[in-house]
């Protein structure tokens, strides 16, 4: 039976320092994170609490084996790490600043705390730039590619029932992950694979960089289905599906639908809802061909021999989801009203993309960006894929408000600025993130380290105290609010 889809987003941001003698992204990222954490701590709005790496197990593979020649992901304990009072993690991952949102209980809340991450990065830029010379400036982009064949990720995480066979997840999640780019692709000028100069614009920023159908790695030989088995919860009950095949969306609607539709598909898989064979015969080439085809008419062959388009696949999945929702408890993915809204938006965007894609420009990033770029190219007589269009592509994702083209694209907003501002420092109330963020703010001097599934306190006794948080839906305000509010210190 499907379980509650607690979820979250990890975003690695692009970074560079304007007018720097040489680019050092690790140093720039460290400056960014440290500047934010120091400024927040000085303002009394948050502590300087480090990350507890004790439970990090990136080499654990859901298939139970580590294939020969596979390089397991590194745990970079030496780089800057901080836990924020909103329950998030803000740190340096390889050569990028990364914001990992707190666990949330709905796709809409996923949007709120993802947007809060954008504001954290904006505040961090301001803080970092105060330390630089007048001619230098840290600039951050919410995108997935530097245009020079280097990609950085936007990863999603979904709690799933451990009892579900992993091969069922692979078989039934792959079609959605390969084809959902038609409505949640962020758009990209050009192609970063050798010899594909004919691709001047495509749906997805990440499609060029995937090489495997299933695998453990996240930076090399990237797989459509990642097998990292690191649940950050009770490993006997839960698995965390780590989805690395997704774009960094500027559209709130696209972020919401990316999370909501995927959560529904995963709930269907947990319930073993009958699904036709939609898996591509060749998943990686299919992923790329779909991204490169702006007509959305590209077909692929399923494992059972059918020929189908990405839009048709999404229509089938949407119809299956509607049938599933009619017979199952939808509270695991937000409830009847939320699911009804998602299904309606799902059908509508597929209709718009098929019949008049311009109608989707207020929701779908690749359409919105393509319209901006197309208008600019026409006005200035630019060839497709020109350097100026590549620069505008980057500017779409620029977090500086006075430069960000996405803010001028007429994208639909789903959440209020007040919600986002609150979420910068406050955690969601209905997951364990509430306890993490609240005790960090309330008992700052007694928290030693924290991670997703535990917090270590120094209560003044002879040994440190570790409080496990192995249940993602516990540690909420409803369960612990009165106790925390009535406690004078962590020992109580």
Where are these regions (language model features)?
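Internal, well-ordered domain-core segments that constitute the primary functional module
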Residues: 126-129, 136-212
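Terminal catalytic/cofactor-binding subdomain
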Residues: 1-136, 140-141, 171-186, 190, ...
């Amino acid at each position: 039976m499907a379980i509650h889809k607690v979820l979250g987003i990890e975003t690695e941001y692009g970074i560079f320092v304007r007018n720097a003698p040489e680019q050092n992204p690790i140093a720039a990222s460290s400056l960014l994170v440290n500047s934010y954490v120091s400024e927040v701590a000085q303002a009394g709005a948050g502590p300087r609490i480090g990350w507890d790496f004790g439970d990090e197990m990136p080499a654990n593979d859901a298939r139970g084996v580590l294939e020969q020649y596979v390089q397991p992901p590194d745990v970079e304990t030496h780089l800057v790490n901080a836990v924020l009072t909103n329950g998030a993690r803000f740190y340096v991952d390889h050569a990028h600043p990364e914001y990992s949102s707190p666990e949330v209980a709905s796709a809409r809340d996923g949007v709120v705390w993802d947007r809060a991450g954008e504001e954290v990065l904006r505040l961090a830029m301001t803080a970092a730039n105060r330390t630089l010379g007048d001619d230098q400036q840290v600039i951050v982009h919410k995108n997935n590619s530097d245009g020079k064949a280097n990609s950085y990720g936007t990863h999603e995480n979904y709690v799933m029932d451990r009892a579900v066979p992993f091969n069922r997840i692979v078989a039934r999640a792959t079609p959605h992950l390969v084809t959902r780019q038609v409505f949640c692709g962020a758009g990209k000028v050009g192609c970063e694979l050798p010899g594909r100069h004919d691709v001047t614009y495509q749906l997805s920023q990440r499609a060029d960089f995937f090489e495997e159908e299933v695998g453990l790695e996240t930076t090399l030989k990237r797989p459509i289905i990642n097998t990292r088995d690191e649940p950050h919860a009770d490993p006997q009950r839960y698995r965390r599906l780590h989805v690395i095949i997704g774009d960094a969306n500027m559209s709130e609607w696209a972020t919401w639908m990316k999370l909501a539709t995927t959560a529904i598909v995963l709930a269907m898989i947990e319930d073993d809802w009958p699904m036709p064979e939609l898996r591509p015969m060749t998943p990686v080439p299919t992923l790329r061909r779909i991204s490169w085809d702006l007509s959305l008419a590209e077909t692929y062959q399923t494992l059972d021999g059918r020929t189908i388009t990405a839009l048709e696949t999404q229509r089938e999945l949407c119809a299956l989801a509607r049938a599933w929702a009619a017979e199952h408890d939808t509270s695991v993915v937000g409830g009847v009203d939320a699911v009804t809204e998602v299904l309606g938006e799902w059908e509508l965007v597929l209709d718009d993309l098929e019949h008049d894609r311009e109608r989707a420009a207020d929701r779908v990033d690749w359409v919105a960006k393509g319209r901006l770029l197309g208008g600019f190219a026409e006005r200035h007589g630019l060839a497709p894929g020109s350097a100026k269009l590549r620069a505008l592509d980057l500017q779409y994702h620029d977090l500086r408000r006075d430069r960000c083209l996405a803010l001028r694209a007429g994208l639909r907003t789903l959440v209020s600025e007040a919600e986002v501002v609150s979420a910068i420092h406050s955690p969601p109330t209905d997951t364990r993130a509430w306890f993490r963020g609240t005790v960090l703010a309330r008992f700052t001097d007694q928290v030693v380290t924290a991670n997703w599934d535990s917090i270590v306190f120094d209560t003044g006794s002879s040994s440190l105290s570790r409080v496990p948080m192995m249940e993602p839906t516990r540690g909420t305000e409803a369960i612990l609010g009165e106790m925390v509010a009535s406690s004078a210190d962590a020992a109580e």
